[in-house]
Amino acid sequence: MGSPAAGTKPEAIRCQHLSKYYGDVAALKPLDLSVPAGSVFGFLGRNGAGKTTTIRLLTGLARPTSGSAWVDGVETTRADSRARQNFGYLPQDPAFYNWMTPVEFLDYIARLFPMNRAQRRQRIEEMLSLVGLKDAETRRIGGFSGGMQQRLGIAQALIHRPPVLFLDEPTSSLDPAGRYELLDLISSLRGQVTVFLSSHILADIERVCDTIGIIREGELLLVAGRDELLSRYATNVIALEIDRDCLPLLNAFVAQVETQPWVAGLTAANNVIRVNVTDTAAARQALLPLLVQHGLLLNRYEWLRPTLEEIFLTLSQ
């Protein structure tokens, strides 16, 4: 891999023309992707869109039909055990030895890596504290809730201090409390580890990810920063909530606004007005003076932004 350009973040994950076909069926169409180091990257798609296939190819757990992938500068699409030192992986349905305690399980995993006993003990303590399981270190894993098991799964994936962490649908089977705890944990890793998070749950991606890729039927539709994505698909709609004491004055205001050349449409429901504008600069300059001119008191003035769900539904039609 070449050196990153000055002023850009180094790439933690990269792939070129990565694909997977089963006969004529494309599980993943040729994919070119770059994920900056230290970011939380959200890989969003419906069930069956190709998210798990992509992760398996990026981690070397499946062989691609074509293309190559690198994690932390080491190619993963060749049979090279060095690459597995560079990432941690939590599959969608992780398996545990239910008769073990979390300490026993993490020690079992840590023995796969070059750590002596003292190093393993220290790292296990660090991981249990990080994922909030220190108080449960003597309990059997079989008695853990789903959220506790997923947090233990992240601990085992990070036990060897990898620079990259792959999480495949980590919250899909959790209740709301478990999801909240796990998302807080994932968010806390930002800047320390590069996280590649696949999910079909839009709220989770929107909450913790700073960069988002959307995949549909094995094809990557786009990659963008979360805020950039929301801005790119923004609708030019202003919501005005007028004080109810001013309702008798509202009709005259609405009638005048409808005549403005920058107005594409207007709806009014009780004391809330939504104005669809064609020229945002003109609207910003003119609306507030019009409110003052008509003696209206304003409770709320808001440029509406689409939700990630609305963007996703638009793109995945």
Regions found by a protein language model. Name each.
Residues P10-C15, K20-R216, L220-L222:
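ABC transporter nucleotide-binding domains
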Residues G132, W262-L266, L297-E302:
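A short linear hydrophobic-aromatic micro-motif
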Residues E181-T278:
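ABC transporter nucleotide-binding domain
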Residues M1-K9:
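Pre-NBD coupling/linker segments of ABC/ABC-like ATPases
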Residues G88, P114, G213, S231-A234, ...:
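A generic structural signal for secondary-structure junctions
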Residues S19, V103-L106, L202, D227, ...:
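Alpha-helix N-cap/helix-start and coil->helix boundary motif
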Residues G2-S3, D279-Q317:
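C-terminal coupling/interaction segments
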